[in-house]
């Protein structure tokens, strides 16, 4: 976790789970809000996943990703077990190293190299906010395919960071004005660059097909 910038950690918590350090794997406030929305809409529209629940899905694929109450129950049970076993910092580190950022990348380090061509420790605040903005739907907010959407989503993350005290109003205005500098195509490395590129493109097609 020491190699991941503090502002990246802050951006994830501000955007994905603001009560991360206060709950035990399940946020009762989020559950109550989600239940209210689902009852009013007479359907399953609002989820209530904490960071730990998201990690549970990432680590244990048998939990599944479908929108159902059964999946949520399995997810919550696994999340509570994770919270009992690991510290909050360990959970955050595992999450950041396994979460999907789109374009065939998993984890902050791989995503930073894919979009910016550098190491995660070199990320600026606005760059971290853009990467975190991808998490709800990497295909929809891809800075390569949908730069306008990506910028708006990045600004939403920056606003959340400002509102929760992670950055000042002046910093928010400064970072919000930054243009996107995503790297479209990185030079291929390794002994089989064309095969690697072929696999990467297959993964990107899967992302688009699943809208993730």
Language-model features, listed with the residues they occupy:
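Flexible, acidic/glycine-enriched loop-and-adjacent beta/alpha segments
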Residues: 3-51, 109, 116
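Non-catalytic, structured segments within soluble enzyme domains
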Residues: 43-212
């Amino acid at each position: 976790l020491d190699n991941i910038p503090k502002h990246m950690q802050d951006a994830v918590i501000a955007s994905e789970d603001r009560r991360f350090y206060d709950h035990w794997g399940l946020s009762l406030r989020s559950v109550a809000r989600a239940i209210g929305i689902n009852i009013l809409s007479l359907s399953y529209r609002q989820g209530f996943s904490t960071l730990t629940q998201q990690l549970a899905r990432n680590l244990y694929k048998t939990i599944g990703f479908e929108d159902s109450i059964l999946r949520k129950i399995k997810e919550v049970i696994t999340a509570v077990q994770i919270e009992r076993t690991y510290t909050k910092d360990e959970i955050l580190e595992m999450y950041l190293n396994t979460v999907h950022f789109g374009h065939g990348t998993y984890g902050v380090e791989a995503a930073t190299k894919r979009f910016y061509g550098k190491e995660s420790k070199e990320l600026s605040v606005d760059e971290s906010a853009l990467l975190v903005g991808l998490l709800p739907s990497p295909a929809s907010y891809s800075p390569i395919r949908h730069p306008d959407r990506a910028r708006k989503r990045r600004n939403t993350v920056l606003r959340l960071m400002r509102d929760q005290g992670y950055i000042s109003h002046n910093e928010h205005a400064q970072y919000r004005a930054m243009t996107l500098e995503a790297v479209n195509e990185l030079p291929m490395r390794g002994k089989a660059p064309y095969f690697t590129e072929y696999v990467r493109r297959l993964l990107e097609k899967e992302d688009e097909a699943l809208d993730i």
